[in-house]
Amino acid sequence: MITLIEIKKSLDEILSKIDGDKKYINEVAKKITPITYKLLYINETKCIRCNLCYKECPVDAIEKAKVKKSAKIIEDKCVKCEICAQTCPVGAIYVIEGRAEIEDSEVHYTIKEKSIPHRKIRLKKYELDENTCIKCGICARFCPTNAIKAVRRKSIEVNLDLCMGCGACAEVCPKKCIKVERELGEVIKTRDIEVDKNLCVGCLVCIEECPINAIDQDGDKVKINKDKCILCGRCVDVCPTNAIKMWEKK
């Protein structure tokens, strides 16, 4: 976790600017629980147009990249599962976490960039139809490993020893004369999740809210299919009895 911003400010200083009963406001303020949020965004200058994030997003929350436009996260559809960040072969997707809390009569506000593990990616097969290729060089422009060397309108060379198999070249090729087959590793489970059956009241709100239908009714309780779960935390947020817990693995 990399700290980007850290602010500490006296609670008394903040409350002094608020009208009303200072003693009452101070007591209420100290009972406020920490507020957290998470934001994912794509660095447009680093995006290589491979569209792996678009293809791997389980809730279709990413707009497909085009030659002149990077991929884009659709905020109101994103469930913050971090799969896109794990999948991006060049680390162009950032996960930012913010937290505000009152501690020792101070308001603490921090913004951090979360360290994300990356799925393995490996080239399996590469095909270039040289008869169709117009040697425009767009593929070379977006190749993140400089595996493609092109002389505009004259020649193109691909060094497969350098190719990682991201498929950016195939995505941007105007003639669709490149085919790439890759091996993509499993999503890395950085968190775990459990249902406390003693707290679960069987309201089934979590089942209704799960974006990928990974929760099933289990008698008068619920159970989570961990193989299917994307660990987005939506069920944790909506559970009225705090029966679902999710935590970071060490």
From Swiss-Prot:
CDD domains to which the protein is assigned, alphabetical: MtMvhB_like
Binding site for [4Fe-4S] cluster: 47, 50, 53, 57, 78, 81, 84, 88, 133, 136, 139, 143, 163, 166, 169, 173, 200, 203, 206, 210, 229, 232, 235, 239
InterPro entries: 4Fe4S_Fe-S-bd, 4Fe4S_Fe_S_CS, Fe-S_Ferredoxin
Domain of life assignment: Archaea
Keyword Zinc-finger in annotation: no
Keywords: 4Fe-4S, Electron transport, Iron, Iron-sulfur, Metal-binding, Repeat, Transport
Disulfide bonds: none
GO MF term set: 4 iron, 4 sulfur cluster binding; metal ion binding; oxidoreductase activity
Domain 4Fe-4S ferredoxin-type: 38-67, 69-98, 124-153, 154-183, 191-220, 220-249
Pfam families (alphabetical): Fer4, Fer4_21
Keyword set includes DNA damage: no
Name of this protein: Uncharacterized polyferredoxin-like protein MJ0514
Source species of the chain: Methanocaldococcus jannaschii (strain ATCC 43067 / DSM 2661 / JAL-1 / JCM 10045 / NBRC 100440) (Methanococcus jannaschii)
Lineage, opening ranks: Archaea, Methanobacteriati, Methanobacteriota, Methanomada group, Methanococci
